[in-house]
C-alpha cells in the first residue's frame, strides 16, 4: 500500500481563533502516537491567522480510516465544527 498525504485546512470564525487553535494543537500529540502515522503537523498562515493547515502523512488508507474513527479525532471535529467557516480536506499521493 502507498502512503496517503493529507492537507486539511480549517478557517476559524474571527472570534473563535484561539479556541480552534487550542483544539487543533490538542489533537497533534494523540495523532502522532497512532499506528501508521508518519507525520502530523499543524501550521498557521502568516498572513491570515484564522487559517490553520494540518499536513499529515499516513502509512496507508487503512491508517487514515482508523484515525478518522478515534475518540480524539471525533472530539476535535465536534469541538470545532460550529467554530469554523470552512473545513477542507484533500487526500493525495506523492508522485515525485
Task: Show where each model-derived region lies.
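N-terminal hydrophobic or amphipathic segments with adjacent small-residue motifs
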Residues: 2-4, 9, 25, 30
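Glycine-rich beta-strand-turn "strand-cap" elements at beta-sheet edges
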Residues: 2, 42-48, 77-96
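Short, well-ordered beta-strand segments in beta-rich or mixed alpha/beta enzyme
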Residues: 4-10, 41-68, 90
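Short amphipathic alpha-helical segments
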Residues: 16-38, 72-76, 80
Amino acid at each position: 500500500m502507498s502512503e496517503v498525504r493529507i492537507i486539511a485546512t480549517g478557517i476559524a470564525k474571527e472570534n473563535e481563533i484561539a479556541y480552534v487553535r487550542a483544539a487543533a494543537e490538542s489533537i497533534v500529540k494523540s495523532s502522532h502516537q497512532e499506528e501508521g502515522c508518519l507525520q502530523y503537523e499543524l501550521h498557521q498562515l502568516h498572513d491570515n491567522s484564522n487559517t490553520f493547515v494540518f499536513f499529515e502523512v499516513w502509512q496507508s488508507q487503512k491508517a487514515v480510516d482508523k484515525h478518522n474513527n478515534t475518540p480524539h479525532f471525533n472530539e476535535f471535529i465536534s469541538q470545532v465544527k460550529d467554530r469554523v467557516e470552512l473545513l477542507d480536506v484533500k487526500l493525495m499521493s506523492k508522485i515525485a
